[in-house]
Swiss-Prot record:
Pathway: Aminoacyl-tRNA biosynthesis; selenocysteinyl-tRNA(Sec) biosynthesis; L-seryl-tRNA(Sec) from L-serine and tRNA(Sec): step 1/1. GO terms for cellular component: cytoplasm. Its main location: cytoplasm. SUPFAM superfamilies: Class II aaRS and biotin synthetases (SSF55681), tRNA-binding arm (SSF46589). The lineage of its organism: Bacteria, Pseudomonadati, Pseudomonadota, Alphaproteobacteria, Rickettsiales. Belongs to the class-II aminoacyl-tRNA synthetase family. Type-1 seryl-tRNA synthetase subfamily. Homodimer. The tRNA molecule binds across the dimer. The keyword Aminoacyl-tRNA synthetase applies. This is Serine--tRNA ligase. HAMAP family: Ser_tRNA_synth_type1 (MF_00176). Catalyzes the attachment of serine to tRNA(Ser). Is also able to aminoacylate tRNA(Sec) with serine, to form the misacylated tRNA L-seryl-tRNA(Sec), which will be further converted into selenocysteinyl-tRNA(Sec). ATP binds at residues 259-261, 346-349. Keywords: Aminoacyl-tRNA synthetase, ATP-binding, Cytoplasm, Ligase, Nucleotide-binding, Protein biosynthesis. InterPro entries: aa-tRNA-synt_IIb, aa-tRNA-synth_II, aa-tRNA-synth_II/BPL/LPL, Ser-tRNA-ligase_type_1, Ser-tRNA-synth_1_N, SerRS_1_N_sf, SerRS_core, tRNA-bd_arm. The gene is serS.
Amino acid sequence: MLNIKWIRENQKLFDEKLSQRFIEPMSSKIAMLDREKRKIMSLIQEFQHARKVKSKILGNMASKSGEEFEGLQRDVKHINEKLEALEQDLNNNNELNELLNMFPNIPDEEVPYGMDESMNKLVRTYGETNPNALNKQHFELGIKLNLMDFEQTAKISGTRFVTLKGDLAKLERALINFMIDVHTKELDFFEISPPVLVRDNAMYNAGQLPKFAEESFATTNGYRLIPTAEVPLVNIVADTIIPREKLPMRYVAYTPCFRSEAGSSGRDTRGMIRLHQFGKVELVSITTPEESKNEHEYITNASETILQKLNLPYRVMLLCTGDMGFAAKKTYDIEVWLPGQKQYREIASCSNCGDFQARRMKARYKEFGSNETTLVHTLNASGLPIGRTMVAILENYQNEDGSITIPDVLINYMGGLQKITAYSE
């Protein structure tokens, strides 16, 4: 959520930032609703003060009868009626909060202006792409190996699901353990095993609701399946005040993730790129406003480290204003090279959300010896999605005979297996 005080004091700048997100100017409407709300709150305070004064006089009166006493009683009753009506008006005046809840985060000054991914800015590349490399797509390889099943799975669960078998199932497990080990043993992240069912309020805190309600799966009793472990991880600090010396707090978690893929009809309908259910290792960092810029680079580097150890070519893109996620003020996308598609595809998104999520969930910190609290900054990064990493390995490590060479760093995790070959039932 955006800071209403900042909007109030920077109306022109606010409209300029909204225009960078391709949203029409809204400062005038917000200012009007804000004035109405503040007027009601001011009246409530005045009446509360008047009630306190008159109640004190009543309590100190020696005689609990007579015209003066009864007149004060009538005054207090009248004040209570006014307060009840004003508080009802305040509770019913949800338009301002509803409006604020629909605004995305304000872009950082370093974010390039642009409407879509074509305007994203290249930051760096890693590894070399070979235009003459073997170029079968991952689903062709997986099906030929008899280790990736879409057809029978569709009978069980419908489209956008997959069943992995044998050594591909083992590779999935190996990648999870490898990623968690790197992040915890080398990169100072603390492992968490969170729930995958959360309440709506946790989704709201993370910026998933109310804007993206249709993109998640809801149960019939008030829970939602998480679209990313970012949701439970950032909520670890909801409604807390953290001692400054404990920051940064860096968390890593592997979870299954669930997305309805609303609006993705016709996109990546074959293979494992876009599924309703997928596994992902997620990184979250909680830090101070002063350190969030450096922490953004750190958490992005953590995602890159996995790809470097797997020797997978990739590039880092700085997203433009029109391509950033809702809660982000600045985002790097990491795109891995896929020979089967002859293009880079997103494999990780690394975002600095500033105090956007913290304001929603009241996550604060304070210096030692101080009573003053400040909103934390939250950051998140994919570290990495297991399915898309498998896609990249299958396509970049494929051999002429259709087998898949295991990347060196995964051989021990695969029990010494160096190559995945076709499975014969």
